[in-house]
């Protein structure tokens, strides 16, 4: 953690993270939007737990730190030219990359205000098929987090249509299992260890 800003830097390099979505993206000293936005989400959730336990001091500490991290991240990684977050700091020598995952994490983590939701949505999705405007949204890990956020925001009609379209494209008619890749045509294996056969149904029942 950078002591001055409170932002996380170099975590992938120092700890050897192997995220299927983000591994290898960042150079030394760069500020990952996704990681710091999820850090904000962690702090906000921690504040809720402390409030439940009536530990008001710790709750306020978590909220204050989340606000500090969010403000520092907006100052360094938010691009006012397109009203989207860059994957890394705008001060980086690399070209800006306003990808879906970085901006989703910013919305999910409370770094982007709710008033930005419509701009975020139409930057990466369509209201009618084809729904996806980015290949990143095809990743199952992203999909469940995205659905969780949409339901939490009170969205129902579009997410159900999107959910049905997404998983119908993954269904293998031979094995009745979910495909890991849209573009594969060989029989999909059923991996009970990963919950691949039931996870979409459990998610729908829960919501």
Predicted feature descriptions by range:
Residues 1-56, 60-207:
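Active-site core of glycosidic bond-cleaving carbohydrate-active enzymes
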């Amino acid at each position: 953690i950078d002591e001055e800003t409170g932002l996380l830097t170099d975590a992938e390099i120092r700890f050897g993270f192997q995220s299927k979505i983000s591994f290898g993206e960042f150079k030394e000293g760069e500020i990952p939007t996704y990681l710091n936005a999820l850090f904000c989400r962690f702090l906000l959730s921690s504040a809720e737990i402390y409030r439940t336990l009536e530990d008001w001091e710790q709750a306020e500490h978590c909220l204050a730190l989340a606000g500090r991290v969010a403000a520092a991240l907006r100052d360094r990684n938010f691009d006012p030219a397109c009203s989207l977050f860059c994957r890394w700091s705008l001060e980086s020598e690399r070209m800006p990359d306003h990808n879906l995952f970085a901006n989703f994490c910013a919305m999910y983590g409370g770094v982007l205000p709710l008033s930005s939701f419509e701009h975020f949505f139409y930057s990466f999705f369509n209201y009618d098929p084809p729904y996806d405007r980015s290949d990143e949204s095809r990743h199952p890990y992203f999909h469940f987090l995205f659905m969780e956020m949409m339901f939490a925001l009170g969205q129902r009609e579009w997410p159900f249509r999107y959910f049905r379209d997404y998983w119908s494209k993954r269904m293998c008619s031979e094995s009745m299992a979910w495909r890991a890749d849209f573009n594969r045509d060989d029989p999909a294996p059923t991996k009970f260890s990963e919950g691949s056969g039931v996870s979409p149904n459990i998610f729908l029942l829960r919501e």
